[in-house]
Amino acid sequence: MSDIDRSRAQQLMREADIEALVLFQPEAFRYAVGAHAGVATMWGRAGSAIALVPADADAPIAAVVSDHAASLVRRAAPDIDLRCHRIWIDIVDLSGAETIAQVDDAYRRNNSGGPRPETFVRAACFGLLADLLRERGLSAARIGADLEFMPAADFLALRQALPDVDWVDGSPVLRRLRAVKSGREIELLRRAAAAAEAGLVAMAAAVRPGAALGGLSAAWKAGAQAHAAKSGFSLSGHWDYISVGPALSDMAAVVTPGALIKADVGTLVDGYSSDGARSFSWGPVSPLAADVFSALEAAFASGLEVIRPGNTFGAVHAAMLASMRRQGFSEYYRGHFGHSVGGGVGIEEWPFFSHDNPEIILPGMVVALEAPFYGEGLGALMIEDQFLVTTAGAECMNSLPRTLRDLSRA
């Protein structure tokens, strides 16, 4: 099922003066339709999967997909108005067939025989979209497309194929829609955060003198996967940025006495990525490292106080930067102190806790608040947690303490 709040989508589209969204990015397609866009999206070109979301909340969502993906889309989203195009993959329903002649009959019966394209035919896809727009009375409408994704060559072809449509950038509307999560999305992000945190526990247990960075990464991954399996779900992906010691880019680093260990990690559940970080050491750290981490703790607390509905993302950045200034860091400057999380292309999603960002914090957003410091010759330190914004404030999805933990004392 779609994760779009159709009432909110209607409001945002009316404010943007558009009559529909037409979405081409695979992740946006899945968000709108509730099903994967199919293998023909692998080249990052527009057309093989298209979602049409009318501004009218009562009008059904429609989609253009490949014949290869059609059955999966129908099962996942039976209410979608679906149009299909042929791609290169030959597939036929052989139910009941026992001979080669019956195989040929099956092709004819299912209308799946005949020539197929090298990949997919963009013009055919745009033609199916034109049919949908004509049937919905949108052939000459002002329509928003996700131009932040769409390749320039494909957009040029789209405008040539549908010249009467007033195409505008619908990306801001899509971003605002995706920033507020559905209940399903929130649950996926909770699971992802829990798995990543279980991985941190496993990683911490593997830290000892001589332990290699690669081994810590493997321990984290194993712990995250074990938690997911035990909890009855699977991971669709994972990532980690772990640093050990004073050389930030030394991927062959090993744990030594006094070494700082920073683990910025996330797992994906059904395409939705968590984001969190903790800092550790093996043995006492230098006075400078202790001072830096103390400042990060204060900045994190200052930012967290501001994560309330009605405040701006920029206000969080201002609070954290002001805290660092009070701690004596007059030159330190982060471009952002965190961001939304979800099921988009990257780990970090808009909106960001950045300077003067006027975007309003809303209930239902899931965000990652981060306070990092990278010091070549010292090491990396970071605090990051994931929060659900509620009407009362911010609910943390993590449980590990935010301290700089000396693992030699564990």
Predicted regions and their residues:
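Active-site neighborhoods and metal-handling regions in enzymes and metal-associated proteins
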Residues: 1-410
